[in-house]
From Swiss-Prot:
Keywords attached to this entry: Cytoplasm, Fatty acid metabolism, Isomerase, Lipid degradation, Lipid metabolism, Lyase, Multifunctional enzyme, NAD, Oxidoreductase
Ranges for region Enoyl-CoA hydratase: 1-190
Family indicated by similarity: In the N-terminal section; belongs to the enoyl-CoA hydratase/isomerase family. In the central section; belongs to the 3-hydroxyacyl-CoA dehydrogenase family.
One Pfam family here: ECH_1
Entry GO CC: cytoplasm
Role of this protein: Catalyzes the formation of a hydroxyacyl-CoA by addition of water on enoyl-CoA. Also exhibits 3-hydroxyacyl-CoA epimerase and 3-hydroxyacyl-CoA dehydrogenase activities.
Name of the protein this chain belongs to: Fatty acid oxidation complex subunit alpha
Location relative to the cell: Cytoplasm
Coiled coil: none
Length: 714
């Protein structure tokens, strides 16, 4: 049976051809290799129509033009030559669209990304809607690739080389007004008249390309170009630490096209695309993409979720304010905040105001839309307005008695169906639910700070939590724009449990004489966004170390922090960035001043600050402990699968995405190699490095995680 076409042609009475894109059976349009013949058949018909005046590409999907190429198509390539051939096929198709003798216009609404934008760039003009859902970008770098269907050659010539480099190197997505300002689109119109506006543009002569700004014209010349590529190359190397080969290839390919002409540029683009598709970095990044897509589809349990019409939040602090923001402004649900202090409510409301006002200033949001979203948030110092809330998120201090009191108050003041979700980072959910009248409706919902930026949430059912409570909480997390993983109710849950030994080891190396900046730089070089010492300063030393005694009590001395170090730091009133002094010193708030290591930290903890370890040795000690603990979590079913373990580490603590997560990384090294490294470290530094039993067994049998445990472990 022949597959229905994703592209349909309709020639209007005014001789404008409208090509409608609608991939059968899919929510979003993505480009597949088999579509090439469909488009070529349409191009043949268009060339044969001598009365044709213009062509418009438009999507039939409600909220996307084309979201990019189908990633499976790339994953199915076995060799660089196959992936290169795929790119050349895409380039050829775009060239045929561009070569049509009449004006070709892309009518864009919703996501126009990757191959979708490359198709739009091959058109002679572009019109897009002013809808917030409309975004344009080339995000291939986030998958360890580069645009392979002409994007590296067409975009710099259209909007200028420096602007194009920023878009392609970062995967940055532009809104409609930004795209218009840069000359990426020719017009921005309301959704209701998109087709009419595109048709009118198609009836005119081909839109002439806008002259580039003087700065861009200078940078396109040989001298300006040499300076620009040297400067951008240096900046990119600093940012990526050489861990992402795609960025260097992007620079090379764009420079080749500008220096040697488009023919050489297209050739270099296809070749680089093929080679990058086979790199371990791209394979790891694509695996993360597939895994996160699966997690977003996972309902969490077999039960249907309960309806969610409104949410309550207990506590207006930093976490409460952030949770209120994502609930109202991302999930679109009415939120009522309860705090014993009116200032707490004001703080939470200001948090959302600041976030939304920033969007208004950047012209990402209309003032009227800001006001509409803010109107969803209200506050109270008692339980008025809580009677019919479907789910209450508790975000008060980490105190068990206080949280148990909150459960009792919610059960007394809210409906019988109301779910109680605790944003605890360390307390057992079973203990919080211990005196509950309806323990089946008590669950953990652990957000990470800052709430609006961190994509992960941990959902923690205790043994008595109902399947419907799990499903409803997962549903809320997804509405809030989060990636949820369901984890077992054991001390530290998953993310904090694998993070604690990593940070502990960094502190231990400090006491041995390694310098703060050397430890942090070593882990940044390894691929983490910030080093462990800086991370502790950012989170707050008091907050970040609170969980260590909990973990030590649960799992023994492998979680013990170096004796007296943490207490010495806290007794010296060092909390990190929030009070201006931690391991680093911070300038006055509001002033841009570079943080500096406080030299007083070394005598305070009885260290010399004269280290002997190389950067790889520092990274090895921190990372190996994290890997070992992740495997223990899988063994104890703290995480349901290796998929959740990799996603949790990448999205929760910034484990290097190009390594694919702890389990993919162990697979790439081989369990035998990991065990050998850990045994060597155990001999040198102590029993905390002893590899767990599962790793040793896998090493003996030559097993890997993703080939043996790719499905959920219940």
């Amino acid at each position: 049976m022949e597959m229905a076409s994703a592209f349909t042609l309709n020639v209007r009475l005014d001789n404008i051809a409208v090509i409608t894109i609608d991939v059968p059976g899919e929510k979003m349009n993505t480009l597949k290799a088999e579509f090439a013949s469909q488009v070529r058949a349409i191009i043949k018909q268009l060339r044969e129509n001598k009365d044709l005046r213009g062509v418009v590409f438009i999507s039939a999907k409600p909220d996307n033009f084309i979201a990019g190429a189908d990633i499976n198509m790339i994953a199915n390539c076995k060799t660089a030559q196959e992936a290169e051939a795929l790119a050349r096929q895409g380039q050829q198709l775009m060239a045929e669209i561009h070569a049509l003798p009449v004006p070709v216009i892309a009518a864009i609404h919703g996501a126009c990304l990757g191959g979708g934008l490359e198709l739009a760039l091959a058109c002679h003009g572009r019109v897009c809607t002013d809808d917030p859902k409309t975004v344009l970008g080339l995000p291939e770098v986030q998958l360890g690739l580069l645009p392979g269907s002409g994007g590296t050659q067409r975009l710099p010539r259209l909007i200028g080389v420096s602007t194009a480099l920023e878009m392609i190197l970062t995967g940055k997505q532009l809104r409609a007004k930004q795209a218009l300002k840069l000359g990426l689109v020719d017009d921005v119109v309301p959704h209701s008249i998109l087709l009419e506006a595109a048709v009118e543009l198609a009836k005119q002569d081909r839109p002439s390309s806008r002259p580039l700004p003087v700065r861009e014209r200078i940078l396109a010349g040989p001298l300006g170009r040499a300076l620009l590529f040297k400067m951008v190359g240096k900046k990119t190397e600093q940012k990526t630490q050489g861990n992402y080969p795609a960025t260097k290839r992007i620079l090379d390919v764009i420079e080749t096209g500008l220096a040697q002409g488009t023919s050489s540029g297209y050739d270099a683009e296809a070749r680089a695309f093929g080679e990058l598709a086979m790199t371990p970095q791209s394979q790891a990044l694509r695996n993360i993409f597939f895994a996160s897509t699966e997690v977003k589809k996972d309902p969490g349990s077999d039960a249907p979720p309960a309806p969610l019409n409104s949410v309550g939040i207990l506590g207006g602090g930093l976490m409460g304010g952030g949770i209120a923001y994502v609930t109202a402004c991302k999930a679109g649900l009415p939120v009522r905040i309860k705090d014993i202090n009116p200032q707490g409510i004001n703080h939470a409301l200001k948090y959302s105001w600041d976030q939304l006002e920033g969007k208004v200033r950047r012209r990402h949001l209309k003032a009227s839309e800001r006001d509409k979203q803010l109107a969803l948030i209200s506050g109270t110092t008692d339980y008025r307005g809580f009677a019919h809330r479907d789910l209450i998120i508790e975000a008060v201090f980490e105190n068990l008695e206080l949280k148990q009191q909150m459960v009792a108050e919610v059960e007394q003041n809210c409906a019988a169906h109301t779910i109680f979700a605790s944003n605890t980072s360390s307390l057992p959910i079973a203990d919080i639910a211990a005196h509950a009248a309806r323990p089946e409706q008590v669950i953990g919902l652990h957000f990470f700070s800052p709430v609006e930026k961190m994509p992960l949430v941990e959902i923690i059912p205790h043994a008595g939590t109902s399947a419907q409570t799990i499903a409803t909480t997962v549903k809320l997390a997804k509405k809030q724009g989060k990636t949820p993983i369901v984890v077992r109710d054991k001390a530290g849950f998953y993310v904090n449990r694998i993070l604690a030994p990593y940070i502990n080891e960094a502190i231990r190396m400090l006491t041995e004489g390694e310098r703060v900046e050397h430890i942090d730089a070593a882990l940044v070089k390894f691929g983490f966004p910030v080093g462990p010492i800086q991370l502790l300063d950012e989170v707050g030393i008091d907050t970040g170390t609170k969980i260590i005694p909990v973990l030590e009590a649960a799992y023994g001395e492998r979680f013990s922090a170096p004796a007296n170090v943490v207490s010495s730091i806290l007794n010296d009133d060092r909390k990190g960035r929030k009070n201006g002094r931690g391991f680093y010193l911070y300038g006055q708030k509001g002033r841009k001043s570079k943080k500096q290591v406080d030299p007083a930290i070394y005598p305070l903890i009885g260290a010399q600050g004269q280290g002997r370890l190389s950067a790889p040795q520092v990274a090895e000690r921190c990372v190996m402990l994290m890997l070992n603990e992740a495997v223990r979590c899988l063994d104890e079913q703290v995480i349901r699968s290796v998929r959740d373990g990799d996603i949790g580490a990448v999205f929760g603590i910034g484990f290097p995405p190009f390594l694919g997560g702890p389990f993919r990384y162990i697979d790439s090294l081989g369990a035998g190699e990991v065990v050998a490294i850990m045994q060597r470290l155990a001999t040198q530094y102590g029993s905390r490095f002893t590899p767990c039993e599962r790793l040793v067994e896998m090493s003996k049998r030559g097993e890997s995680f993703w080939k043996t445990t790719a499905t959920d472990l219940q």
